[in-house]
């Protein structure tokens, strides 16, 4: 019997955690994932996308994220009917399923050639902005959001000769993380795992005159509170903080999923962030400005954003 005031030990739970985090477990899971990747590749791009979307919609019927998404959509779009919001939600699950299988075909999916624009599956709005960032000799920041297939952005930038140092969340499985790193870095710029040292690596890249990219639409517990769809959220202030420190251009970028397996990539002109009385970028107001841009994107294509995330806490 456990003594009063002391927690019971959970040896089975600890043992399970140790086993699942072991090298053997990581290797076994990676073996299964690699087999699944091979199976997806054998389906071909179009069929795999349809299957991925259908599977995601089916799974979505049974998970708690669907209830959260319905709650988020009702708060964000009270003017829409329940049927309209449900249609958006089905689009969210379809898009997520498609995005997951598109990882397998990312090298073929981004078939853009800067010398022959308009011939592949990727339309680009803001070619002049890509070229200006590439040639201006300045560091730069690109912010984006989890819209459509967000991985396409960095690949397109690299095709225009603009490699971007990108922040990403590494999988907990070390073997899978290494696979993804190798695959991604062959197609885009350097990847920096989002951890405690990430800010220093990103800052070092800007010191070298490079360009950095980051997704800024998810919850950040230590960030300032800013409005998002009429409600306060804790937002990631890193874009505004870096822009304040380096006084470099800030651009927004997004991917839009189009019919028939096509995409449109858009890079905005420099976004003017508010400044304080000393002429420096105001971090809180700058973060609010970034989130207002993201909100505009989401309102335009709500079915292409991840409403499954607990954004309002």
Q: Model-derived features: where do they sit?
A:
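Non-catalytic C-terminal accessory region of glycerolipid acyltransferases
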Residues: 2-9, 20, 24, 43, ...
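Membrane-anchoring hydrophobic helices of lipid-metabolizing enzymes
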Residues: 2-144, 181, 188
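Short Gly/charged-rich anion-binding patches and loops
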Residues: 35, 68, 128, 152, ...
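Generic structural signal for isolated residues within well-ordered alpha-helices
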Residues: 38, 72, 156, 179-182, ...
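Residues that cap or flank secondary-structure elements
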Residues: 61, 121-122, 145, 172, ...
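Catalytic core of membrane glycerolipid acyltransferases/transacylases, capturing the structured
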Residues: 109, 134-195, 221-226, 232
